């Protein structure tokens, strides 16, 4: 029986989970539309979740909330977490840095002073991109030669950033190649070309950036 996901009809916290599942597992998703608040709250405490929230993930008797816990569970099922304490710690390090990368944009995206904060964010962005470029190096993926959940976390963060600054990867060809490599994975390519793929919004509908009903007038590269 396919696992079940539940989340709003946004990319938000769920998108890396969707990408990971599209890469290697069948699932069904309960999408909650913008005006489905009452629908969600009527079901919230009826799903058997220990800490009810969105996103949620139900795989037989395993019922989880919190996007990182969901990602780690799925990744662990597919041997992506590492087999030694050192490998697992390194994966955790990449996870934390990927969360920081996405939350850095999220923090300013919901702030009423977004336009003011954006200037400082963009000023620091090249340093952040260089850090990730140096970390990736000549490897095709962040853990070396095989795809893992952290690749989808970083892909999604970088893709969101490209909507704010379409040229952010111009000086980092290995990151450009990394993004193209993820997009070219057969199952990911098929998903992105399907009507199930959510292109927008990146964040909640009320966000100053990444919300609303349509992306910025400029398109990311």
From Swiss-Prot:
Keyword Disulfide bond: no
Class in the EC hierarchy, top level: transferase
GO molecular function: glutathione transferase activity; identical protein binding
Gene3D superfamilies for this protein: 1.20.1050.130
Assembly: Homodimer.
Recorded family membership: Belongs to the GST superfamily. Mu family.
Protein name: Glutathione S-transferase class-mu 26 kDa isozyme 1
Lineage: Eukaryota, Metazoa, Spiralia, Lophotrochozoa, Platyhelminthes
